[in-house]
UniProtKB/Swiss-Prot annotation:
<keyword id="KW-0460">Magnesium</keyword>
<keyword id="KW-0456">Lyase</keyword>
<dbReference type="GO" id="GO:0000015">
    <property type="term" value="C:phosphopyruvate hydratase complex"/>
</dbReference>
<dbReference type="Pfam" id="PF00113">
    <property type="entry name" value="Enolase_C"/>
</dbReference>
<comment type="subunit">
    <text>Component of the RNA degradosome, a multiprotein complex involved in RNA processing and mRNA degradation.</text>
</comment>
<feature type="binding site">
    <location>
        <position position="343"/>
    </location>
    <ligand>
        <name>(2R)-2-phosphoglycerate</name>
    </ligand>
</feature>
<keyword id="KW-0324">Glycolysis</keyword>
<dbReference type="InterPro" id="IPR036849">
    <property type="entry name" value="Enolase-like_C_sf"/>
</dbReference>
<dbReference type="InterPro" id="IPR000941">
    <property type="entry name" value="Enolase"/>
</dbReference>
<feature type="active site" description="Proton acceptor">
    <location>
        <position position="343"/>
    </location>
</feature>
<feature type="binding site">
    <location>
        <position position="246"/>
    </location>
    <ligand>
        <name>Mg(2+)</name>
    </ligand>
</feature>
<keyword id="KW-0479">Metal-binding</keyword>
<dbReference type="InterPro" id="IPR020809">
    <property type="entry name" value="Enolase_CS"/>
</dbReference>
<dbReference type="GO" id="GO:0005576">
    <property type="term" value="C:extracellular region"/>
</dbReference>
<dbReference type="InterPro" id="IPR029017">
    <property type="entry name" value="Enolase-like_N"/>
</dbReference>
<feature type="binding site">
    <location>
        <position position="318"/>
    </location>
    <ligand>
        <name>Mg(2+)</name>
    </ligand>
</feature>
<dbReference type="GO" id="GO:0000287">
    <property type="term" value="F:magnesium ion binding"/>
</dbReference>
Amino acid sequence: MSKIVKVLGREIIDSRGNPTVEAEVHLEGGFVGMAAAPSGASTGSREALELRDGDKSRFLGKGVLKALEAVNGPIAEALLGKDATDQAAIDQVMIDLDGTENKSKFGANAILAVSLANAKAGAAAKGMPLYEHIAELNGTAGQFSMPLPMMNIINGGEHADNNVDIQEFMIQPVGAKTFREAVRIGAEVFHNLAKVLKAKGLSTAVGDEGGFAPNLESNAAALAAIKEAVEAAGYELGKDVTLAMDCAASEFYDKEAGNYNMKGEGKIFTSEEFNFYLQDLANQYPIVSIEDGLDESDWAGFKHQTELLGDKLQIVGDDLFVTNTKILAEGIEKGVANSILIKFNQIGSLTETLAAIKMAKDAGYTAVISHRSGETEDATIADLAVGTAAGQIKTGSMSRSDRVAKYNQLLRIEEALGAKAPFNGLKEVKGQA
C-alpha cells in the first residue's frame, strides 16, 4: 500500500512570479502526496543550492527545468518500489544519489519537493494527518502544540522596495489563549497599522511577505508605528503583544570595511556598536526576539550579542545556521545565539530538518519554523510546527494568500486537535518562560 509507483515533477509559479519545483509521489494504494519548494531572497551563503537553469531567454534565467530533469529522471527511478513511510530512507537515497555536500547536482529545490511530497503520501497511506505523521517521524508521537506566530507586519530590506534597512518588524500576540485568538489579534493590529500609516501619509503597499512597506525616517519609527497600531486596536504593547525583528544584517554588512552600513538611517556601526544599538531598541520597546542581528560570518560579534542580550532575548540564527546540524553544533559549542530558524529549503530534506530541530531542542535552543519570501500555497510548515511542537512560527503577515494559507491550515489543525495541542504563547520564546 505504501510502495512508490510514480514520482513526477512540474514547474509552477511562486509568490514572486518565479518558477519553482512541485513534486508528486504516487503510491500503489492510490495515495498521492504533492508539495512545492519555497525560495528565499536574503539567503545564507552556506545554504543548500537552489538549482536554476540560468537560461536568460526563459524566466530571466530562473527556470527550474534542470531540477525537474533530476526529479523525473534519476530520483524517480531510484525511488520506485521504496516504502514512502520510511522517510529517512527515502531522503537518504536522494542525498546519496546527489552525492554533493550542498545538493548542487540535483538542487535542494528538487530533493526537498520530493521529500515533502513523499511525507504527505506516507501520511495518507497511514491514514493520518501530516502533522501526526511528522510527530511519529520525529520520535514524539502524539506530542503536539500550536505555535506562537511572529507576524511580519512591516517589511524592509530585501523584502521591500523601501528605505528601511531592517528586514522584518514582527508582532507576537502573546496575550492570546488560543492560536485562533492570536490570529484575530494579529489581524486587528494589521488593519489598525494600515490606518496609522495612512494618517501619516505613508504607503500601505505590501512587501514580499504581506507586511506594509513604507519609507520611514528610521527603524525606530517602524516600532513606533506598530506601538500606535497595537494601542489603536485596544491592546497593550508588552502585555498582549510583544515585538520581534529580523535584521537580516548580512544584507547591509560591508565585508571589505567590516562594518554595518544602514543606508536608510545614514549610520555605520561596528559589530559591538550594532549590538548596543539593538540593546537600546530593546530597552525602548518590548522586543523579545532578534534574528540575524549580525552578518552570518561575524561569529565573534554574535558571541558578544548573545552574552549582552541572550539572557533576556531570543537570539535567532537564520543565515548564521542555515538549518544545518554541522553549523548549529558549532554554534552550540561556542555559545553563539540561543535559537535557530528552521527553513526546509536551506538544508533540502524533511529528515535533515527534523534533525536540526532535535539538536536545537536537546541543547536548550528554541526552534522557530519559517517560510521563505518566495512561497506557494503549500502549507507544509504549518504541519511541521505542530508535529514537532516547535512552539513558534514565522509565516508572514495577514495578507497574501501564500502567507494566509499557512495560518488557515493551523486554524484547521487547532480545530482538529483541540486540547491535545496547547497554545503556550510567550513561554515558547527563549528567555521569556
